[in-house]
């Protein structure tokens, strides 16, 4: 089962992935970007490098990572539990936040191509309030290029993610990130149907 954990930075995705992975030792844990060697290199360019990249070029680099990630890591392991920290929902939402003139349907089709027509089986979306996001980002102390765009930008991305999920009817668990770690973990296990 291919499961995406979606949401902006600081909402608890990584924590919940770690908890689930500790319970299922054969789970494949990955992330986008950065789940493959190409992804590691692209992540460095996209998030940390001083290289200025155009908006459309940025989208295509993320799509290249997604295609490589799917072909090399996801597709060969589709019979196993795959836990991915981010995926195509993030890709589309960040692209739309960066350029409102983009067509969501075109972005969806490009992602469908990159994923060889195989979207995630289940998606877990973490949503947080302005206050929670602000406090968690401050507690982390560091930021990449995307986080540096500010709180309003991240809230816009979060809103776009939610809209995309609802509009397209993907099988999604909507998580209130302010709930306790334990309660969220139980909700996720019930959603994935592991007992």
Swiss-Prot record:
SUPFAM superfamilies: P-loop containing nucleoside triphosphate hydrolases (SSF52540)
InterPro entries associated with the record: P-loop_NTPase, Thymidylate_kin-like_dom, Thymidylate_kinase
CDD domains reported for this sequence: TMPK (cd01672)
EC numbers: 2.7.4.9
UniProt key word ATP-binding: yes
EC supergroup of this enzyme: transferase
GO-annotated molecular function: ATP binding; dTMP kinase activity
KW Cytoplasm (keyword) present: no
Catalysed reaction equations from the record: dTMP + ATP = dTDP + ADP
Keywords from the named record: ATP-binding, Kinase, Nucleotide biosynthesis, Nucleotide-binding, Transferase
GO biological process: dTDP biosynthetic process; dTTP biosynthetic process; dUDP biosynthetic process
Annotated residues for binding of ATP: 7-14
GO cellular component, one term: cytosol
Alphabetized Pfam families for the sequence: Thymidylate_kin
Matching HAMAP family: Thymidylate_kinase
Cited NCBIfam families: DTMP_kinase
Functional note: Phosphorylation of dTMP to form dTDP in both de novo and salvage pathways of dTTP synthesis.
UniProt xrefs under PANTHER family: THYMIDYLATE KINASE, UMP-CMP KINASE 2, MITOCHONDRIAL
Family note: Belongs to the thymidylate kinase family.
Record protein name field: Thymidylate kinase
Species this protein is from: Campylobacter concisus (strain 13826)
Gene that this polypeptide is encoded by: tmk
């Amino acid at each position: 089962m291919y499961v995406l954990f979606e949401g902006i930075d600081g909402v608890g995705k990584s924590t919940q992935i770690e908890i689930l992975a500790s319970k299922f030792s054969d789970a494949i844990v990955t992330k986008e970007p950065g789940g493959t060697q190409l992804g590691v290199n692209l992540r460095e360019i996209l998030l940390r490098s001083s290289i200025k990249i155009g908006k459309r070029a940025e989208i295509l680099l993320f799509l290249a990572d997604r295609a490589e990630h799917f072909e090399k890591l996801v597709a060969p392991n589709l019979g196993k539990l795959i836990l991915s920290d981010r995926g195509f929902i993030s890709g589309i939402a960040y692209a739309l936040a960066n350029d409102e003139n983009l067509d969501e349907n075109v972005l969806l089709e490009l992602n469908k191509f990159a994923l060889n027509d195989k979207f995630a089986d289940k998606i877990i979306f973490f949503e947080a309030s302005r206050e929670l996001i602000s406090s968690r980002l401050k507690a982390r102390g560091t930021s990449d290029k995307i986080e540096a765009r500010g709180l309003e930008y991240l809230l816009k991305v979060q809103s776009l993610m939610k809209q995309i999920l609802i509009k397209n009817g993907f099988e999604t668990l909507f998580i209130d990130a302010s709930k306790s770690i334990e309660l969220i973990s139980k909700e996720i296990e019930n959603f994935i149907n592991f007992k």
